[in-house]
């Protein structure tokens, strides 16, 4: 696993893979699923409404995963990923605002619920599925296991970080917890927009060549 860190041409693919995997978790998806019912209750929904909203979140996630089996082979990874990350960031900020001003209007709890459900939907269109397989499209056969292992480590690291920090964040800063997730997710969007090349229709060798100069690489310019 350490050899892949010493190869300059693999550093950018590794950074992209690990940031995607970690960002998948630090976008707050597990905070939403782990604490969805609590979130809905804090938003002012009743016990029954909270249960229905939580079930609906899981149902949307499953339906999106099934639809992506059809969409992924036909659509570029870059637009799906960037669109998903950007909209997810906006929805997280909207969720923070809706929960902050939950008592401002009687319909505000429903804005909160819609923001959560929409977030789960857009997450499933890119940020959810793409990080899991992107290493197979960015690394050639020899370094691929190491690249995927580092990505998995980043994923679980992000998962652990959110699981440990979110309860405290929720208690200390309340709704602003989701503003933290929104900021981190927007940072991921900027990094991926600058450096993530389209991998659909390209071999891993071609992707590695495009990213061979590390952070000095310009994947979009090279593709043009």
Across the structure, where does each feature detected by a protein language model lie?
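Alpha-helical transmembrane bundle of multi-pass membrane proteins
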Residues: 1-224
């Amino acid at each position: 696993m350490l050899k892949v860190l010493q190869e300059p041409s693999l550093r950018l693919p590794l950074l992209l893979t690990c940031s995607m995997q970690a960002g998948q978790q630090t976008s707050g998806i597990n905070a939403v699923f782990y604490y969805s019912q609590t979130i809905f209750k804090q938003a002012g929904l009743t016990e029954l409404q909270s249960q229905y909203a939580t079930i609906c979140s899981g149902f949307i996630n499953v339906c999106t995963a099934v639809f992506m089996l059809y969409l992924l082979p036909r659509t570029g990874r870059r637009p799906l990923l960037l669109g998903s990350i950007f909209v997810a960031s906006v929805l997280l900020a909207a969720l923070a605002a809706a929960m902050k001003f939950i008592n401002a209007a009687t319909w505000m709890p429903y804005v909160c619920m819609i923001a959560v459900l929409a977030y789960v939907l857009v997450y499933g269109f890119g940020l959810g599925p793409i990080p899991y397989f992107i290493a197979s499209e960015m690394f050639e056969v020899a370094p691929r296991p190491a690249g995927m292992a580092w990505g998995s480590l980043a994923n679980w690291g992000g998962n652990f970080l959110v699981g440990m920090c979110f309860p405290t964040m929720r208690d200390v800063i309340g709704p602003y917890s989701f503003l933290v997730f929104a900021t981190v997710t927007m940072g991921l969007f900027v990094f991926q927009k600058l450096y993530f090349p389209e991998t659909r229709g390209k071999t891993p060798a071609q992707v590695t060549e495009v990213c061979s100069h590390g952070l000095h690489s310009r994947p979009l310019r090279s593709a043009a």
